[in-house]
């Protein structure tokens, strides 16, 4: 009995000493260095921040130990932390009785070099296993040596054996705890390590290396995509990683306490909260309905016909343009409209980031495609807002939007959402069963026409932020510079023509099925012949109206004539005896409708159907004055950090693209996000105001 007790105590003592050895700090860290480190952190005011990060890690580790989802490495980490905190042998005794032969740990000094084998053969490198998010690494020769730049150096080095990566490499990671923070921090929260490798080179630039939880090294986006595919990971994407050494994961800008603030103006509509802060006064943005996407959907306006031209069934993440039909659509549309496509590189997303705008539009994979929704590299905008944005009050420009974290180049920021409205630019109304509709027009009075994208904001005295200034945005991409034929745009209706009142507009009705529409058309003609419905003309409104109908105003202020029990349409009204209140006329009226007087006093984005679009075609645009998303607050700049891209997501109809914003450079945390309205000076001279962007290349005028 005594021999058995002595043997058990000897085993316990040896294993305790082994754990104590694991917790010994590196010999390279002296007492003076440690004191200096914490003094510097105290001076920077980051002591609380560092321990908060450590505490968060401990809470996660605590939960994993409790529910049994911890990995072997995490079990070892937990024992080391407990041992370092108190070396409580009584608490460890029962745990050490369990079988721990499956855990293999190699302990080496800092100055010793040990081969590290991972999934890729013949790789030799050290592993960074810290509690911090970033680690700086100096490389001399061929072996990197990790030194932390945020917290003290790693207390231990754990090496991994050769294996084939699979779902077990990411098992036990609870990704649902980290969905509303910096998207680039998500891999770090999932036990990935992001190391800066400083190589002795003339440019003295550091290189980024990611370490997977299983020890595999990820040196570029292709290796990241391969790893996520092999492990079947559905909570991480390629754009959650950044190999740009100018992008910091811990760059959090500190702002003054807002006089008025809100943690989420979207009211949980967005997957990421959209914060609001006013540090200048106690005003808030005017009330509006927050919409994640535009309404109504484009496919519904087209009567759910011809929604998608093609769909794919890729299994490689839609990387090969030769096999992906959706990638081919983007390339074909671009090649068709370009006079010469020689020297043009691959079009579309690269690692789920868009480096340059595509003037002819970008086709994403859709709901009909069989490709994996998370691993697909051609699905970005449809995933919605991922960045942490904040609406704030600027000193001179009204409301603006800034990012709360560093953003890499080509990253999707947000879309411009609103209510889709439709007008026609014909001198006479040609209502046919195939006409489209606008349901819920909120601004019948405000409209212009252009072949490209136009932004129109309400004009005020001192600023040009949302709902405060009228801005006309012509094509954000110069078609001429991209080789588009100029003669294709010769017949396009210009904004100047819209303001002069030479063109006449009408609001299209909601399209009905053809069978029902033909019945309604027949009924309308019968009513006109019987005298129940007449056509009346006036100096202000020329259009069909029901007899003895009082003149009323719509919600947007446009004067219309309608019966209390009937709905307004573009082609006529029906008497109360009619079976339907919505009419889609089938024949052109003898009298043209009233001349439209454009005042440009609403927040409106006009959508282009194609470079060949002419004034005879329907004009579709977004009105964000009453309904919209965070994109309605984006300001203008003559030197912007965003560019606009039309993306086809829920339909391939060229009339209904999604208007998306992407970064054209690295944007540091706290920087205001802006885009160029591309206003041509002199186009609307009576509505020009001073541009307040403050850039050296400022044009001084904007609408």
From Swiss-Prot:
Residues engaged in binding Zn(2+) 2: 312, 326, 365, 369
All copies of domain SET, residue ranges: 387-678
Subcellular location: Nucleus; Chromosome
Domain of life: Eukaryota
Disordered: annotated segments: 492-588
Binding site for Zn(2+) 1: 312, 314, 318, 324
Catalytic activity annotation: N(6),N(6)-dimethyl-L-lysyl(9)-[histone H3] + S-adenosyl-L-methionine = N(6),N(6),N(6)-trimethyl-L-lysyl(9)-[histone H3] + S-adenosyl-L-homocysteine + H(+)
Primary subcellular site in the record, as a coarse category: nucleus
Binding-site residues for S-adenosyl-L-methionine, renumbered to this chain: 397-399, 632, 635-636
Function per UniProt: Histone methyltransferase involved in left-right axis specification in early development and mitosis. Specifically trimethylates 'Lys-9' of histone H3 (H3K9me3). H3K9me3 is a specific tag for epigenetic transcriptional repression that recruits HP1 (CBX1, CBX3 and/or CBX5) proteins to methylated histones. Contributes to H3K9me3 in both the interspersed repetitive elements and centromere-associated repeats. Plays a role in chromosome condensation and segregation during mitosis.
Family, similarity comment: Belongs to the class V-like SAM-binding methyltransferase superfamily.
UniProt protein name: Histone-lysine N-methyltransferase SETDB2
Gene field: setdb2
């Amino acid at each position: 009995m005594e021999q058995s007790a002595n043997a058990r105590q000897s085993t316990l003592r040896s294993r305790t000493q082994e754990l104590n050895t694991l917790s010994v700090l590196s010999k390279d860290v002296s007492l003076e260095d440690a004191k200096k480190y914490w003094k510097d952190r105290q001076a920077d005011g980051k002591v609380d921040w560092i321990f908060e990060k450590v505490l968060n890690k401990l809470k996660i580790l605590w939960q994993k130990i409790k529910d049994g989802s911890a990995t072997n490495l995490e079990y070892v980490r937990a024992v080391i932390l407990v041992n370092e905190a108190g070396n409580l042998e009584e608490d460890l005794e029962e745990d050490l009785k369990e079988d721990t032969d499956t855990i293999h740990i190699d302990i080496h000094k800092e100055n010793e070099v040990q081969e590290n084998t991972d999934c890729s053969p013949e790789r030799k490198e050290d592993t960074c296993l810290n509690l911090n998010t970033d680690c700086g690494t100096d490389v001399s020769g061929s072996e990197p040596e990790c030194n932390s730049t945020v917290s003290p150096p790693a207390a231990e080095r754990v090496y991994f054996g050769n294996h084939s990566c699979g779902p077990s490499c990411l098992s036990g990671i609870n990704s649902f705890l980290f969905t509303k923070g910096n998207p680039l921090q998500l891999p770090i929260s999932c036990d990935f390590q992001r190391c800066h490798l400083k190589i002795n080179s003339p440019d003295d630039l550091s290189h980024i290396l990611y370490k997977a939880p299983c020890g595999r090294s990820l040196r570029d986006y292709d290796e990241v995509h391969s790893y996520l595919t092999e492990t079947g990971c559905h909570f991480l994407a390629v754009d959650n990683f950044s190999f740009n050494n100018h992008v910091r994961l811990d760059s959090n800008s500190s702002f003054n306490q807002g006089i008025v603030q809100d943690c989420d103006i979207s009211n949980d509509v967005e997957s990421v909260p959209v914060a609001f802060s006013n540090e200048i006064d106690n005003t808030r943005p005017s009330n509006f309905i927050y919409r994640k996407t535009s309404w109504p959907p484009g496919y519904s306006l087209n009567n759910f016909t011809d929604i998608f031209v093609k769909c794919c069934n890729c299994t490689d993440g839609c990387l090969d343009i030769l096999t992906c039909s959706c990638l081919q659509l983007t390339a074909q549309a671009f090649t068709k409209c370009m006079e010469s496509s020689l020297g043009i590189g691959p079009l579309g997303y690269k690692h789920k980031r868009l480096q340059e705008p595509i003037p002819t539009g970008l086709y994403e994979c859709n709901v009909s495609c069989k490709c994996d929704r998370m691993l697909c590299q051609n699905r970005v905008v449809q995933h919605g807002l991922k960045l942490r944005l904040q609406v704030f009050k600027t000193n001179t420009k009204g409301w603006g939007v800034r990012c709360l974290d560093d953003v890499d180049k080509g990253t999707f920021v947000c879309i411009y959402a609103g209510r889709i409205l439709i007008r026609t630019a014909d001198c006479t109304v040609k209502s046919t069963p195939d006409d489209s509709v606008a349901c819920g027009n909120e601004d019948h009075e405000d409209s212009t026409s252009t072949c490209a994208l136009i932004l129109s904001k309400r004009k005020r005295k001192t600023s040009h932020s949302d709902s405060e200034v009228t801005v006309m945005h012509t094509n954000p991409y110069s078609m001429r510079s991209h080789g588009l034929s100029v003669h294709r745009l010769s017949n396009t209706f210009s904004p100047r023509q819209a303001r002069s009142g030479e063109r006449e507009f009408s609001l299209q009705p909601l399209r009905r099925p053809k069978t029902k529409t033909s019945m309604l058309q027949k009924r309308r003609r019968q009513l006109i012949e019987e005298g129940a419905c007449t056509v009346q003309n006036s100096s202000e409104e020329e259009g069909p109206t029901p007899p003895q109908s009082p003149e009323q105003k719509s919600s947007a202020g446009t004067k219309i004539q309608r019966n209390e029990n009937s709905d307004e349409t573009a082609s006529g009204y029906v008497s109360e005896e009619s079976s339907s209140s919505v009419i889609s006329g089938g024949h052109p009226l003898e009298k043209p409708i009233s001349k439209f007087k454009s005042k440009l006093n609403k927040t409106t984005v006009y959508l282009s159907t194609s470079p060949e679009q002419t004034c005879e075609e329907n004009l579709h645009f977004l009105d964000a004055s009453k309904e919209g998303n965070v994109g309605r607050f984006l300001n203008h700049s003559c030197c912007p950090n965003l560019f606009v891209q039309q993306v086809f997501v829920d339909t391939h109809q060229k009339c209904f693209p999604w208007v998306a914003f992407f970064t054209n450079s690295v944007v540091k945390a706290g920087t205001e996000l802006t885009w160029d309205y591309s206003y041509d000076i002199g186009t609307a001279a009576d509505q020009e105001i001073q541009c307040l962007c403050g850039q050296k290349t400022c044009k001084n005028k904007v609408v």
